[in-house]
Every structure is written in structure tokens, then in C-alpha cells.
Regions:
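Peripheral, non-catalytic segments flanking oxidoreductase cores
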Residues: 1-210
């Protein structure tokens, strides 16, 4: 993935959040597979961001400078054990993703849920050959709430089963300052402003938000 940045002694500490990966020696084939996966998913994410920009009647490259040459992106290989092992139905609590976009490849075991209204959850049923795509908080902020970050959670699978997924997260460079873009009047009228959550402050200076 992305190599560590070359930093001076007086560089802000948050810049050190982006560093080298630690690869398991027991799985030598993992590194080239994930590096290729990252490369392909980065291109998918950029294409989708540019499509969003056009749909918002912005220049196609409106978001390009925010992720730049050093986007903050990462991959998770996730296993959710069955409830008998965890003694809890919670796989991951309700949250929003912090970046621009996230892509989730699921196995056939359901468990991902999306909040469509306060306290109302629906299953994101796995579909073979597809990704679940979540809008993140940075897009919500950049569009003044016209695009809404997806509140989602994961419920642990039943006993004696497991759930596997691969998540890819595309974010901005750590030093990016995210503007609120000017939308055309017909879209701006529907922008509700970004949600305010005192437990999860949304800051325009990306580095200070980590």
C-alpha cells in the first residue's frame, strides 16, 4: 500500500498516522494480492467520486485535490465470529465511515444493516458479485449535507457460523482542508447541513480529525 511519509522532526504528529504496513510472514502471497486489490479499488473510488462531482454539477475533478497523491486509504479483512463465541449480537456498533467512500465485499452471510430512519434498520442483503458502497462523512461535509453519510452496523452471525468481508476505505490526504462546495440552487435547497454529533466532531482539517 502507501509507504511511510518522510517527515521532519517538527512535523505535526498526526502525519505519522500514515506508515508502512506489517505483512504476516506466514502468508507471503497476501501482500501482492492486497496491493493489487488496493490499486484497483482506488481507481474504482476515484471514478465514482468523479461521477458524484458531475451529478452535483461540479467540475469532474472537483475532489481530486483532496485525495491527491497520498490518499488516506486502508483495507480491512474482517471475520465476525458466531454469537456463541462472542456472547453478544453486536459485531460492530452503529457508526458512519469518516472518509469519502467505502466499499464492502461480503460473503453470503447477512449481518450488515443500514439505518433508514432513527431506530429503523434494514438488512443490506449480500448480492453475489456486488459491493456495498457507503458515503462517508467527508462527502457529507463537502456537499453541506446534500449527500448523507450512511449510518450502519453489523450484527454477529448465529452460533456456529461466521461472517467474512473485505472493506476498502478511500479518504482524503491527511493535510487536506475540505471545503463546502457551492451547489446549484436546486440541489442547495435540499442540502440539510452536516449532522452534528458531539461524540464524533466533523472537522474540515482532516488531520486534526484523527
Amino acid at each position: 500500500m502507501i509507504s511511510a511519509l518522510t517527515l521532519s522532526d517538527d512535523a505535526p504528529r498526526w502525519q505519522r498516522l500514515q506508515g508502512p504496513n506489517l505483512w504476516p510472514a506466514a502468508l507471503p502471497s497476501l501482500k501482492p494480492v492486497l496491493l493489487h486489490w488496493q490499486q484497483q479499488m482506488t481507481q474504482v473510488g476515484i471514478r465514482l467520486l468523479r461521477a458524484f462531482a458531475e451529478a452535483l454539477q461540479l467540475p469532474e475533478n472537483a475532489f481530486d485535490r483532496l485525495y491527491g497523491d497520498q490518499p488516506n486509504e486502508h483495507i480491512k479483512l474482517i471475520r465476525y465470529p458466531g454469537q456463541q463465541e462472542t456472547q453478544s449480537s453486536q459485531g460492530v456498533g452503529a457508526h458512519k465511515d469518516s472518509g469519502f467512500l467505502s466499499f464492502l465485499l461480503q460473503d453470503e452471510q447477512k449481518g450488515l444493516q443500514v439505518e433508514v430512519a432513527p431506530g429503523q434498520w434494514i438488512d443490506a442483503v449480500p448480492l453475489a458479485g456486488s459491493f456495498v458502497v457507503n458515503i462517508g462523512e467527508l462527502l457529507e461535509l463537502a456537499t453541506n449535507g446534500y449527500l448523507r453519510a450512511t449510518v450502519h452496523r453489523v450484527v454477529s452471525p448465529p452460533a456456529q457460523q461466521q461472517r467474512l468481508s473485505i472493506a476498502f476505505f478511500l479518504g482524503a490526504q491527511l493535510d487536506a482542508v475540505v471545503p463546502v462546495y457551492t451547489l446549484p440552487p436546486e440541489l442547495a435547497r435540499e442540502a440539510r447541513g452536516p449532522d452534528s454529533d458531539p461524540h464524533n466532531p466533523l472537522l474540515r482539517d482532516v488531520g486534526w480529525n484523527y
